[in-house]
């Protein structure tokens, strides 16, 4: 079953895959990494002007990584805002996804956190560097195949 946005994208020949609806009835779409930036711009122009959140997760050990975007279409005079969830999957061997920082500025810290925890590189992000872990940290802590070090260096804060 396709939602209204999926039908709208299909009429315009924009490649995507409908993943159905979540428990709140929000449509979920899968977009290929190479198509994500252009579709993000189209969605912004179409009215999805608010990025509610961006997160990422490891789908399975040795499998794909996913970057998830929750977008909201806010319009004056409309009581119920339209929402959509976009999932962009990438291979863990070279996890690269175009950054949408230049479309929605609120992805700045969120894409940095996804990079820091899962190692997804967001191409053309202006400040893509670790945000939670020290720069010297080796590995990506939220990957399912991550092996935690058996020691942690505690530094004196003074």
Swiss-Prot record:
EC class name: translocase
Gene Ontology, cellular component aspect: chloroplast; chloroplast thylakoid membrane
Catalytic reaction(s) noted: a plastoquinone + NADH + (n+1) H(+)(in) = a plastoquinol + NAD(+) + n H(+)(out); a plastoquinone + NADPH + (n+1) H(+)(in) = a plastoquinol + NADP(+) + n H(+)(out)
Entry GO MF terms: NADH dehydrogenase (ubiquinone) activity; quinone binding
Highest taxon in the source lineage: Eukaryota
GO BP, sorted A to Z: cellular response to sulfate starvation; photosynthesis, light reaction
Matches recorded under PANTHER family: NADH DEHYDROGENASE [UBIQUINONE] IRON-SULFUR PROTEIN 3, MITOCHONDRIAL, NADH DEHYDROGENASE UBIQUINONE IRON-SULFUR PROTEIN 3
HAMAP family according to UniProt: NDH1_NuoC (MF_01357)
Family that this chain belongs to: Belongs to the complex I 30 kDa subunit family.
Protein name: NAD(P)H-quinone oxidoreductase subunit J, chloroplastic
Organism: Arabidopsis thaliana (Mouse-ear cress)
């Amino acid at each position: 079953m396709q939602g209204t946005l999926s039908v709208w994208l299909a009429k315009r020949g924009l490649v995507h895959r409908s993943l159905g609806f979540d428990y709140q009835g929000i449509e979920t779409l899968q977009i290929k990494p190479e198509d994500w930036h252009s579709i993000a711009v189209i969605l912004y122009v179409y009215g999805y002007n608010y990025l509610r959140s961006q997160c990422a997760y490891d789908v399975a050990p040795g499998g794909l990584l996913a970057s998830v975007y929750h977008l909201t279409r806010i319009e004056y005079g409309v009581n119920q805002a339209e929402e959509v969830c976009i999932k962009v999957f990438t291979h863990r061997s070279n996890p690269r996804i175009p950054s949408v920082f230049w479309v929605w500025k609120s992805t700045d810290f969120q894409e940095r956190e996804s990079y820091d925890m899962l190692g997804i590189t967001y191409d053309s992000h202006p400040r893509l560097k670790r945000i939670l872990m020290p720069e010297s940290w080796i590995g990506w802590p939220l990957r399912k195949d991550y092996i935690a070090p058996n020691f942690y260096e505690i530094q004196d804060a003074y």
